[in-house]
């Protein structure tokens, strides 16, 4: 995951106040009726809520709205605004705080990897009740499994179990392609697992940064081709290679557009597919000004979307 960023909670709040991103919150919160989202012609650009962990979740929606985001990828993981052990009432309140200022919560991120997770059914039940259409589960590792096919069969059973619960609550499952030892980093294994599963209910959260890290610039296009028929969501990050030693290289996060990802090709493919789901921006690079980092990456995505979707 990413490194800790430099700004303190007090500095973030001061910066938001100076930029007019914090408003008074007098009086009790009143539930707002949820209405179906309006038809879209472009993706829903979101920020991963964990990047705002230093402020209360009640303020997350206002901050994202005033920064110019369309919505929020809401983290429901240990150490987040809404840790799994505090689902009630925080998950519902967190969603209300975001949707109440006119933003969408098109996806939640979880660490759930099994239908037997003690919190998994409750997370999906509340999210389904609140109308959240997508959830991202956690990650499965290959580990030291002596037989890769046996391990993949185990993962398939876990995915089927989770997807069955999610479907009961009208939520689709979006599997994130990570890197390293995570099952599906190269997508071919996950593609095999998903071949017999209804694509309406299980698909991909495609990450071109991890795809480029795994397969290179040219290979990333092939991985996206595998994901596109089942694409549910997108997560964006960028990176460059840096050498920690003469014999090794390390993926170092950087602002969008300053790394190795072929963004022109990526957004052109999204536009051709008429993709209008969530694009989650994750900011894991070091910065002394988080708000400006969010603005930079949001502006980059907006520019790419405008160019690609106008040309498509």
Name the predicted role of every residue range.
Residues 1-19:
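N-terminal secretory signal peptides and thylakoid transit peptides that target proteins
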Residues 16-17, 58-61, 104, 113-206, ...:
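Active-site acidic/histidine proton-transfer and metal-coordination neighborhood
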Residues 24-55, 59-63:
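C-terminal segment of N-terminal export signals and the immediately downstream linker at the start
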Residues 43-49, 72-74, 105-110, 135-137, ...:
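Hydrophobic faces of well-ordered beta-strands that scaffold small-molecule active sites
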Residues 60-77:
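Catalytic domains of carbohydrate-active enzymes, especially glycoside hydrolases
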Residues 64, 72, 98, 127, ...:
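Conserved, mostly hydrophobic/aromatic
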Residues 75-93:
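Glycine-rich, proline-tolerant flexible connector loops at the mouths of alpha/beta enzymes
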Residues 166-260, 267:
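Acidic/histidine-rich catalytic cores of soluble enzymes
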């Amino acid at each position: 995951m990413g490194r800790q960023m430099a700004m303190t909670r007090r500095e973030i709040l001061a910066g938001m106040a100076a930029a007019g991103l914090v408003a008074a919150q007098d009086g009790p919160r009143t539930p707002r009726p949820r209405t179906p989202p309006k038809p879209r012609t472009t993706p829903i650009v979101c920020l991963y809520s964990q990047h705002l962990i230093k402020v209360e979740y009640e303020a997350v929606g206002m901050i994202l709205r005033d920064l110019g985001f369309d919505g929020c990828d809401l983290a429901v993981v240990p150490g987040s605004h809404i840790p799994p052990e505090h689902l009630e009432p925080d998950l519902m309140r967190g969603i209300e705080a975001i949707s109440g200022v006119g933003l969408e919560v098109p996806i939640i991120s979880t660490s759930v990897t099994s239908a037997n997770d003690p919190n998994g059914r409750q997370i999906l039940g509340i999210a389904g009740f609140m109308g959240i259409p997508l959830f991202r589960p956690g990650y499965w590792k290959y580990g030291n499994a002596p037989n890769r096919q046996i391990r993949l069969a185990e993962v398939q059973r876990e995915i089927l179990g989770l997807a069955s619960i999610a479907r009961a609550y009208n939520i689709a499952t979006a599997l994130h392609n990570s890197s390293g030892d995570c099952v599906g980093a190269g997508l071919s294994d996950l593609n095999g697992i998903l071949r017999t599963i209804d694509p309406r209910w299980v698909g991909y959260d495609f990450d071109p940064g991890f795809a480029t890290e795994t397969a290179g610039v040219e290979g990333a296009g092939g991985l996206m081709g595998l994901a596109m028929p089942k694409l549910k969501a997108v997560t964006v990050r960028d990176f460059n290679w840096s050498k920690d030693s003469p014999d090794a290289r390390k993926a170092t996060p950087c602002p969008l557009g300053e790394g190795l990802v072929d963004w022109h090709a990526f957004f052109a493919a999204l536009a051709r597919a008429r993709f209008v789901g969530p694009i989650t921006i994750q900011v894991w690079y070091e910065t002394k000004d988080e708000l400006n980092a969010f603005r930079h990456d949001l502006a980059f995505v907006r520019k790419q979307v405008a160019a690609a979707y106008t040309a498509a």
